[in-house]
Amino acid sequence: MPEGPLVRKFHHLVSPFVGQQVVKTGGSSKKLQPASLQCLWLQDTQVNGKKLFLRFDPDEEMGPPGSSPPPEPPQKEAQKEGAADPKQVGEPSGQKTPDGSSQSAELVPQGEDDSEYLERDAPAGDAGRWLRVSFGLFGSVWVNEFSRAKQANKRGDWRDPSPRLVLHCGGGGFLAFYNCQMSWSSSPVVTPTCDILSEKFHRGQALEALGQAQPVCYTLLDQRYFSGLGNIIKNEALYRAGIHPLSLGSVLSASRREVLVDHVVEFSTAWLQGKFQGRPQRTQVYQREQCPAGHQVMKEAFGPQDGLQRLTWWCPQCQPQLSEEPEQRQFS
């Protein structure tokens, strides 16, 4: 699943289409029925963590003043630099996907908190005007171009990826959404205090959450406190902070938790800026065999017993496990 920086890039790609009417639709989505969007007007787009929200209206009226918040500082600064490839963006340091973008091969949940949203074929009245887009493992947005196969799939076919949704707009351009789930909702779920890339990100709330008596690698992936944070950011922030992924938050000092939050924000912001400047975000431990110091990197799946196990990379020498911390086997 694309992490916060990449989804914000998707938001940037979609934004120029706001104010245009959808004149033609396409795509393979069966739950959404792409034809239900034809003749609607794209009036707004918002982003929160790993989710993208698009507002559609049946007429050309604009939304209420202030419905779309101004760009956040990291995004605004990055936009000034300009994007190297405005058509499509991918993940750093991963394997090649069927459409040629770079992604991790690990399993990830296909959408979070789906029960909060109603899936309908079309918006009804004032309700359901916001289309919520949750991207899958190889999720992407393309502008005025379709994704093409750059390698054969497992069956040996050179079949181009099929977009879930295609929106041709009155301005002459089109958007193609790949590997995503879409559902209608009455309003966007936007909580800036939890978004790691928002200027309103609540550090105090995040620090309090990190103090829980559970491995910090679990807490970092909790979107209630670190919206937009995924497995890449988790691994890189922990390595840069010198914290073992299974360290209990309750045994870490306040200063170490502060350092960890600093690295979460710094790495995420640098990744976002790199997206707009056409620079790949280099990782130091994620999917690496050695850390920058030349030590062997360990890899294992960690997660709650009743939750998803996520692949985790760490350096035992740079991120030592303290004696008062539990053994790894208790949490793997």
UniProtKB/Swiss-Prot annotation:
The molecular function GO annotations come to:
class I DNA-(apurinic or apyrimidinic site) endonuclease activity; damaged DNA binding; DNA N-glycosylase activity; zinc ion binding
Q: What is its EC number?
A: 3.2.2.-, 4.2.99.18
Which protein is depicted?
Endonuclease 8-like 2
Where are residues bearing Phosphoserine located in the sequence?
Answer: S68
The cross-references to PROSITE patterns, in alphabetical order and at most eight, read: FPG_CAT, ZF_FPG_2
Q: Biological process (GO) annotations?
A: base-excision repair
Localization per Swiss-Prot or TrEMBL: Nucleus
Q: Mention any one GO cellular component term assigned to this protein in its UniProt record.
A: nucleus
Organism equals: Pongo abelii (Sumatran orangutan)
Explain the regulation of its activity. Answer: Acetylation of Lys-50 leads to loss of DNA nicking activity.
Q: What is known of its domains?
A: The zinc-finger domain is important for DNA binding.
Q: What is the lineage of its organism?
A: Eukaryota, Metazoa, Chordata, Craniata, Vertebrata
Q: Which residues of this protein are catalytic?
A: P2, E3, K50, R310
Reaction(s) catalyzed by this protein? 2'-deoxyribonucleotide-(2'-deoxyribose 5'-phosphate)-2'-deoxyribonucleotide-DNA = a 3'-end 2'-deoxyribonucleotide-(2,3-dehydro-2,3-deoxyribose 5'-phosphate)-DNA + a 5'-end 5'-phospho-2'-deoxyribonucleoside-DNA + H(+)
Main subcellular location: nucleus
Residues bound to DNA: N231
